[in-house]
């Protein structure tokens, strides 16, 4: 028995060291933390467990529109304490050719409980294939590592449902896409200054882990799936998927990216959705700046017998600056044409906040305030409808632990 144990210990070593490189699991913050990994003696096998826990205090105040005072509905709703993410997972690689990641979000339910489950096969730096459940290649805001975002809430223009004067077979879509099941080719070329992603996904989102799609009735023979692509230029080398890291305050990185996708027979075969986006992000020393602009076109499937089409757009600009080694101040201006270009008026969401990275504890404290404004609507009814379900005043304070 002692010989067997000795052989195992000689083949596998447990290393406990500071983790300064970015782990490609797309989930946890590596800022200022120490972790451990199990690694074979030759480095052919690496296994790393991780966790991310977020607890938030929220205050949301809503306008009177949409509230029924007869039922004593209050202006303050959806407030209190919440756990946005409680993630437990592990990631690793084998022979520097295959990497893998599996994690659950215990704060979610249904299919979203499984947040990620994928493996990545690397032919070379220019060509790899990822299969499973992972982030779709669309928008800098979503592709940022969870836990390394500038503010605790991603831009509202990506997460809020659009408005249209028709009833779909499912909820109205959002411009953002997020996690999905599929396969994707990706790679880095030109000394890591150019990247690409091209993938096919179910198009049903993070809450569905089964195959539910069919062939398109409108485009004969085409599977009713989600087709996505993204290209990016990084003039100063690979851009880390972070929006602020106190361990990386002496670097210079930039990314300019274009992305596009189409979801065939989305919303339970109600619509065909096409999206496009532009991304720009810049990090130099203590400063981080990013801006995005995105667009979505919705056309109805033939079976809906609706001739209307709708176009939506949105975007944001945000900046963060480390005023001290552990303190980052943040501001964002977010805007969206939620009721489609066929009607006048937009919503805009200015926000500001701060991040405090508590040294040597793996803790990160985030706080933000966001205001919901409306501008340019033709009628008061249009103005009232445009922010239904969205808080006029929103405050979030979140404490995060990552390991």
What role is predicted for each listed range?
Residues 4-54, 403:
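N-terminal periplasmic/intermembrane-space "pro-region" immediately following the signal or transit peptide
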Residues 33-35, 227-242, 352-355, 398-400:
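Short, well-ordered amphipathic alpha-helices
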Residues 20-26, 118-122, 223, 248-403:
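Outer-membrane beta-barrel pore domains
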Residues 211-257:
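Loop-centered beta-sheet repeat module
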Residues 72-76, 103-105, 169-171, 209-217, ...:
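Extracellular loop and loop/strand-boundary signature of outer-membrane beta-barrel proteins
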Residues 197-199, 207-217, 241, 269-270:
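A short secondary-structure junction signal
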Residues 36-62, 67-69, 73-206, 223-238, ...:
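Outer membrane beta-barrel
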